[in-house]
Amino acid sequence: MALNVVILAAGKGTRMRSDLPKVLHPIAHKSMVQHVIDTAHSIGSDAIQLVYGYGADKLKSTLGEQKLNWILQAEQLGTGHAVAQAIPNIDDNDTVLILYGDVPLIQASTLEALLAARPEYGVAILTVNLANPMGYGRIVREQGKVVGIVEQKDANPEQLAINEVNTGIMAVPGNALKTWLDRLSNNNAQGEYYLTDIIAMAHADGVEINTAQPQSAIEVEGANNRVQLAQLERAYQAREAEKLMIAGANLRDPSRIDIRGEVTVGMDVMIDVNVIFEGKVVIGNNVTIGAGAIIIDTEIADNAEIKPYSIIEGAKLGVAASAGPFARLRPGAELMQDAHIGNFVEMKKAVLGVGSKAGHLAYLGDAQIGAGVNIGAGTITCNYDGANKHLTVIEDNVFVGSDTQLVAPVTIGKGATLGAGSTITRDVGEDELVITRVKQKHLTGWQRPVKIKK
């Protein structure tokens, strides 16, 4: 029995006041619908039907080449009509799981519980109890059993008092779904084909209907405007921050951290305020991350430190390495064990060897730097000739004086010393001292010009 997921994503989202389709608005730098797609994949879906309408080109360009079946709903005539568009891709023996592209926080564990609750030949619906159920369809029960769902606009006063509401998420057998959708009517206050009407049909047909509930109501909340979108963003961030703390991280203020990807932490990690994580970030034990740091697709080993306001992207930090404050590691940068870069140092496609240091004001690009090297302030690897990038090699125990330019391709041998202010254009041998700056002159009796009075 295959798991066939139908994701409804056809709405325009007028209240968003945006040209972007509603489901493409982001939570943690990922579209709402992508969150739903990822969750569907995580529970082992065999097929995903994406029912779309408004903004087709933007949807397809954003979601790209994913394992999706694209189903056009040319007219938006209700949720039942939307699901009906996917019927040609649904087999009788499928379990059909219906999800919503603007409900991004639904958890895999909740969907697994819903699927487990579905009887072999029956239906399972996800419900939630709300203190204020205004706007939601009410779950109607008789002697504890679900007999139907009534929408807010069609409910009588007794039904409006019900606190258990429909989330719209349900698991239905494929053959029964086809039968019930064929029987839908739009004879209601909205003039739409309600998917929820199939629950009353199931009851009338003697089909068993079970329910499940999410751990938190926030899982099933959607976003119809930017205020609600921001609320979902905060809820998502709170959930991700909690995961980090449970895994072993101390967050200075859990409400002031942004997680926009997958972050793995070791034990005794200290994270200060206003840190942003993007992409895949792996953090070892006893790592310290200072305030305002931005860390993207990076691996950080045990005992490393990222000081405040550093930007680290596509980089690796070895054991006890440190960067910052105000440092920048660009893709391909690596700090080996005990290596250090300080304020206003930038590295790209460069390796700084074990125990080597670049304390301040340097650019190290396309460089292989050995162990025990000192990079003076103002050092620049001149790696670009206007057309191609070239490699600078600095071997172990080299001392590079301040304000030195190394014009690549160039190799500096072990133990060499480069005098401050030098421009190095040729290879330097081991243990050599190289000074290329102009010889200092002393002009005695020099008369400094004075300002002419007007």
Swiss-Prot record:
Q: Which positions are annotated as binding UDP-N-acetyl-alpha-D-glucosamine? A: 8-11, 22, 73, 78-79, 100-102, 137, 151, 166, 224, 330, 348, 363, 374
Task: Identify the stretch(es) annotated as Pyrophosphorylase.
Answer: 1-226
Q: What is its main location?
A: cytoplasm
Q: What cofactor is needed? A: Mg(2+)
Top-level taxonomic group = Bacteria
Q: Where is this region: Linker?
A: 227-247
Give the PROSITE patterns listed for this entry.
HEXAPEP_TRANSFERASES
Q: Does the keyword Magnesium apply?
A: yes
Q: Which residues cross the membrane?
A: none
Tell me where it resides. Cytoplasm
Q: Which GO terms describe its biological process?
A: cell morphogenesis; cell wall organization; lipid A biosynthetic process; peptidoglycan biosynthetic process; regulation of cell shape; UDP-N-acetylglucosamine biosynthetic process
Identify the residues that bind Mg(2+). 102, 224
Q: Which Gene3D superfamilies match?
A: Hexapeptide repeat proteins, Spore Coat Polysaccharide Biosynthesis Protein SpsA, Chain A
Q: Kindly name one Pfam family recorded for this protein.
A: NTP_transf_3
Name used for this protein in its record:
Bifunctional protein GlmU
What broad taxonomic lineage does this protein's source fall under? Answer: Bacteria, Pseudomonadati, Pseudomonadota, Gammaproteobacteria, Alteromonadales
Q: Which gene produces this protein?
A: glmU
